[in-house]
Design a protein with these regions (language model features):
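Membrane-helix interface "capping/anchor" motifs
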Residues: 1-3, 87-99, 142-153
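Long hydrophobic alpha-helical segments that form multi-pass transmembrane helix bundles
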Residues: 1-80
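Loop-to-transmembrane alpha-helix initiation sites
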Residues: 2-6, 122-131, 152-154, 170-183
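Alpha-helical transmembrane segments and their membrane-interface exit regions
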Residues: 13-15, 103-109, 131-137, 180-190
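Hydrophobic alpha-helical transmembrane segments in multi-pass integral membrane proteins
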Residues: 20, 24-25, 111-116, 121, ...
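Structural signature of hydrophobic alpha-helical transmembrane segments
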Residues: 66-76, 119-131
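Conserved mixed alpha/beta catalytic, RNA-binding, or beta-rich assembly cores of soluble enzyme
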Residues: 76, 87-117
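Hydrophobic alpha-helical segments embedded in the membrane of multi-pass proteins
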Residues: 77-81, 98-106, 125-138, 153-161
Length: 191
């Protein structure tokens, strides 16, 4: 595959209906499945960070995924367990997502997007956005990724830099999607 099909589909939906893609039901609400939707929606931590505000969600809730955002991308404990499982099975190389997330963490520590501590900035950038999900399941997958070890290392670093750049200057909340599609193109040139 030249592009990750899931990312391509999500990109299409994001570009066509961004107001619907990034509207999340408030935590612990029961949105209607059929008929008119009356559930209250709220913004994700990624949006709060993108406008330079401090997230009001505490760090424990962030780690447990008890905050609005894309379904399946926010429970940090589950995602970390998945990463370790995939690495133990040999499906991914553990160092690939760790390098990408390390680049994001370093930039978040030195250049936080809002007025809070370096540690909180790193934490929210990694666990409050879809970065952890994207680096584990999409950037590390072997089909659209680089094939040589040197290429994987370079790809992980470049992905981290692009993710930081998009998170700080991009137009949409979830920069990992755009970074993934760019890396799909770049990886073919890295090898």
């Amino acid at each position: 595959n030249l592009f990750n099909p899931a990312a391509g589909g999500l990109l299409f939906v994001t570009l066509c209906w961004p107001q619907l893609v990034f509207a999340y039901p408030a935590t612990f609400t029961n949105p209607e499945v059929f008929g008119e939707v009356t559930a209250r929606t709220t913004n994700s931590i990624a949006y709060v960070l993108s406008v330079g505000s401090v997230p009001s969600t505490d760090m424990t809730s962030v780690m447990l995924g008890l905050h609005p955002g894309p379904m399946g991308t926010l429970n940090g404990l589950v995602l970390l367990a998945c990463m370790l499982y995939l690495a133990a099975r040999g499906s991914i190389r553990l160092w690939q997502p760790l390098i990408t997330l390390g680049v994001v963490a370093v930039f978040a520590a030195f250049f936080p997007r809002a007025a809070y501590s370096s540690l909180a900035s790193m934490y929210y950038e990694i666990f409050g956005t879809a970065a952890l999900f994207g680096t584990i399941f999409m950037l590390s997958e072997p089909v659209t990724g680089a094939t040589r070890e040197e290429g994987r290392l370079l790809s992980s670093i470049v992905a981290g830099l692009l993710l930081v750049g998009y998170n700080y200057f991009g137009a949409y909340q979830q920069g990992i999607l755009f970074v993934l599609l760019l890396m799909n193109i770049i990886n073919h040139h890295i090898d």
